[in-house]
Amino acid sequence: VTVLTRLVDLRDLQPSQLYISEAKLDRIERKFDTSHPQGVPPVPIVRLDGRWMLTDGHTRAFALYRSGAREVRVIDEPDALDWAAYRVCVDWCLDEGIEWVGDLAGRMLPPREFEQLWLLRCRRMQEELARLRGEG
């Protein structure tokens, strides 16, 4: 199966994540050549409310940004995800002034803090959405 990728300016992608895991960033920067978009696997994006949004790959995109790259290879998000949850995450980002991956600079956290401040927050939000939908 051939997956079509294209290059997109990092400034044109809305993050859906408030923080970057320092540990994951370190692994990515050691594993891939982050000096150019072809050195990193493509990141999935989707058009949500008129804007291109990262659904995953925030750390890869941020690693490219840190190395001075201006673009990232993207693929269209292949899965049907919980778009209500992503809208909540994007709203959190906008409330914190995060409108592109460069805005995540200074928001890198060690693993324990990343778990507490981001992953647990997302889990609670997903549980609340499930409760509101009558799923929980």
Predicted feature locations:
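Basic- and aromatic-enriched surface patches that contact anionic nucleotides/nucleic acids
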Residues: 51-136
